[in-house]
Amino acid sequence: MVCIPCIVIPVLLWIFKKFLEPYIYPVVSRIWPKKAVQQSGDKNMSKVDCKGAGTNGLPTKGPTEVSDKKKD
């Protein structure tokens, strides 16, 4: 059996999105400061260099070899 909040919460979210948000959003967008919506000034955060990362995510210094031989 499904719990009551699992049914009620999605229905309330759908009602808010469909009927209430079109009326509330224009009012809030005038009051809310524009700075809170914009991205931060640090543009280096979006640049990622993956050349030195191995398959496990750790940086590698040189070529690695995978040995198929079992070591005892």
UniProtKB/Swiss-Prot annotation:
This is UPF0729 protein C18orf32 homolog. The keyword Endoplasmic reticulum applies. Residues 1-33 are annotated as: Necessary for its localzation to the endoplasmic reticulum and lipid droplets. Undergoes ER-associated degradation (ERAD). Belongs to the UPF0729 family. It holds the Pfam family DUF4512. Interacts with DERL1 and AMFR. InterPro entries: UPF0729_C18orf32-like.
